């Protein structure tokens, strides 16, 4: 009786994805960081001229479209701004890296010795980018429906966890999470004015998440004004990011 063959490393990854590549070179390319040496070269001498960044570009668009469609179908009465915020939370670098870690994606990546020694297999940005590249590779290999199935499998828990009555209300927290996921500093809030008698005072607050970007908010309390300022700042950031992707 023949012993059952143990799956190879990449076969284990395919099992975790529940998708088997017909073009194995696409899978290899998706897992190749730009620091990886060319085959046969010494580490650090010649870096790969083919790496996963173009696939990452493609996978980013594929992922955004699929997640956008899922949110659009599930939340029929939710306005565009709120859908954009939920999508940003689902596909930000930290969220992607967590999905990548569940797949143990770091262990399969090809990268240079220096990058690996500096913790490259655990870096949020590298893991998130590799996951997007993987989705781009699946799209090229099996088409959009195959990519949809994999995204649904990987992100089902996150999408199911969104509850309209609980999410999207604390804009200060949403803004903080958005910035932290991108490795940016926390926003700076400042009270611009506080006018009127104590029982009818109106506060105007500014929120600076980045040097050249500012949100403004008004409210009957400082906290309410900060929430409105954070909401506007977050919407401006998402709008800027969407324009960048376009």
UniProtKB/Swiss-Prot annotation:
Its EC number is 3.1.26.3. GO terms for biological process: mRNA processing; regulation of gene expression; rRNA processing; tRNA processing. CDD domains: DSRM_RNAse_III_family (cd10845), RIBOc (cd00593). It catalyses: Endonucleolytic cleavage to 5'-phosphomonoester. Gene3D superfamilies: 3.30.160.20, Ribonuclease III domain. The keyword Nucleotide-binding does not apply. Its cofactor is Mg(2+). Residues 170-239 form the DRBM domain. Residues 10-143 form the RNase III domain. Keywords: Cytoplasm, Endonuclease, Hydrolase, Magnesium, Metal-binding, mRNA processing, Nuclease, RNA-binding, rRNA processing, rRNA-binding, tRNA processing. Mg(2+) binds at residues 56, 129, 132. Digests double-stranded RNA. Involved in the processing of primary rRNA transcript to yield the immediate precursors to the large and small rRNAs (23S and 16S). Processes some mRNAs, and tRNAs when they are encoded in the rRNA operon. Processes pre-crRNA and tracrRNA of type II CRISPR loci if present in the organism. Belongs to the ribonuclease III family. This is Ribonuclease 3. It comes from Magnetococcus marinus (strain ATCC BAA-1437 / JCM 17883 / MC-1). The gene is rnc.
């Amino acid at each position: 009786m023949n012993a059952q063959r143990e799956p190879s490393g990449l076969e284990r990854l395919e099992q975790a994805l529940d998708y088997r590549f017909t073009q194995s070179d696409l899978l290899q390319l998706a897992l190749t960081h730009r620091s990886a040496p060319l085959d046969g070269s010494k580490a650090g001498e010649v870096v790969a001229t083919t790496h996963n960044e173009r696939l990452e570009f493609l996978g980013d668009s594929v992922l955004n479209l699929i997640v956008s469609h899922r949110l659009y179908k599930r939340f029929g009465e939710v306005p565009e701004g709120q859908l954009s915020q939920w999508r940003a939370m689902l596909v930000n670098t930290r969220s992607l890296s967590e999905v990548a870690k569940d797949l143990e994606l770091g262990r399969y990546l090809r990268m240079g010795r220096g990058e690996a020694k500096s913790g490259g297999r655990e870096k949020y940005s590298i893991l998130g980018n590799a996951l997007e590249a993987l989705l781009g590779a699946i799209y090229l290999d099996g088409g959009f429906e195959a990519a949809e199935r994999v995204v649904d499998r990987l992100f089902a828990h996150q999408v199911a966890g969104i509850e309209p009555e609980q999410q999207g209300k604390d804009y200060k927290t949403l803004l903080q999470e958005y910035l932290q996921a991108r490795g940016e500093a926390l926003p700076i809030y400042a009270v611009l004015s506080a006018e009127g008698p104590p029982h009818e005072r109106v506060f105007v607050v500014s929120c600076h998440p980045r040097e050249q970007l500012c949100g403004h908010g008004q409210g009957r309390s400082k906290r309410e004004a900060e929430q409105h300022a954070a909401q506007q700042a977050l919407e401006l950031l998402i709008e800027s990011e969407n324009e960048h992707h376009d």
